[in-house]
Swiss-Prot record:
Keywords: Activator, Transcription, Transcription regulation. Belongs to the poxviruses A23 family. This is Intermediate transcription factor 3 large subunit. Acts with RNA polymerase to initiate transcription from intermediate gene promoters. It holds the Pfam family Pox_int_trans. Heterodimer of a 45 kDa and a 32 kDa subunit.
Amino acid sequence: MDNLFTFLHEIEDRYARTIFNFHLISCDEIGDIYGLMKERISSEDMFDNIVYNKDIHPAIKKLVYCDIQLTKHIINQNTYPVFNDSSQVKCCHYFDINSDNSNISSRTVEIFESEKSSLVSYIKTTNKKRKVNYGEIKKTVHGGTNANYFSGKKSDEYLSTTVRSNINQPWIKTISKRMRVDIINHSIVTRGKSSILQTIEIIFTNRTCVKIFKDSTMHIILSKDKDEKGCINMIDKLFYVYYNLFLLFEDIIQNEYFKEVANVVNHVLMATALDEKLFLIKKMAEHDVYGVSNFKIGMFNLTFIKSLDHTVFPSLLDEDSKIKFFKGKKLNIVALRSLEDCTNYVTKSENMIEMMKERSTILNSIDIETESVDRLKELLLK
C-alpha cells in the first residue's frame, strides 16, 4: 500500500485518480463479520440499536442487508436533508409503501421517496419497456396460430408483475413491476432478492461504499470529491473510512482488536506530513495490521490533468491499450489492477505524449495542401 501511494504522489502533478476500488481479504483473526452484522441488521429497525457508538454516526448514512429472502435498508435519518419539494419524489409508481405512520416512519418514507436508492435502481432495471420472448417466437414457427402467448399479471405478496403484449406481435412483451415495501422506524424492508449480489453494504456520508461478502471479504469503492488534492487527501479519505468502519465492527462484533486497529489508523489521520503518513502505513504492513496487510487493489483509473495542446494521434494506441482518449482531448488510463500495471502505463502514456508533441510540431510545420500523401500517412497512421 505504501509503495502505491508513494508512486501516486510522484505523479500527482500530472495525474489524478478517479475510480479507486480495492479489497480487504478475509482473515481468520477477525471472525465472522458478515454473519454477526447480518444478525444485528435483521433483528433491528432502529439505526441507534445497530450502531451504538454515536461518535461514528455522522460518517454512516445507511446499512443494507440483501439475500435471496430479504432486502433490508437501515437509514441514519440525521444524515439526510429535509425534502420540501414534492417534485423530487422518484419512485411512487414503482412501489406500494406500507408504513405505521409514526413520526419516525413517516420521515423514513419521505427519505425513501426522495432518494434514488438501490431498490429504485433495481426495480427500474427489471421494468422492461420491450422484451422479445424467443421461446414464444419458436412456438409461432412450430405451432402455427394455435400457440399460446402469456399476458396478464403474476404476483406474490411482495412483487406484482404485469406482462402486456401486442395482438399482432404477441411475443414482444412490455413488462412492468410494482414492489411492496414495508417501512418501520429506520428500516425499509422488502422480501426476495433485489440485487445481483448477496451482500451487506455500508454507505458512508462521503459516498464511499463498503460491500461485505459471505466470507467477510470486503470490496470498498472509495468516493472522489472535486476538492480532493493529491495523494495526501486520498490517504486521509481512505483512512477516515477505515477508522469509522473498524469502530463499527468493534461495536457489532465486540472484538477489541478492531478498536486497537482504529487507534493505529487514527495516528495516520493525525499525521500532517505525507512522509509521516507513509512511514506509519509501512509500519502497519510490517506488523500485519488489518486494512494494510490484507489490502488488495481491485481497479483504479487515472486521468491526465494537464491540457493536451497538441494534436492527438489515436494511431499510436494499441487496440487493447488501457490508455484512452475521452472526447478527443482527455487522456485517461483505465482498469489498472496493480502498482506494476500503473507504472507501466504511466511510462507508456508519457512516451506517447512526447511522440504526439513531436508529430504535432512536424504537422504544424508542413503545408498539408502540397505535402505528399505518403508523408501524411506516415504522420497520421503509423
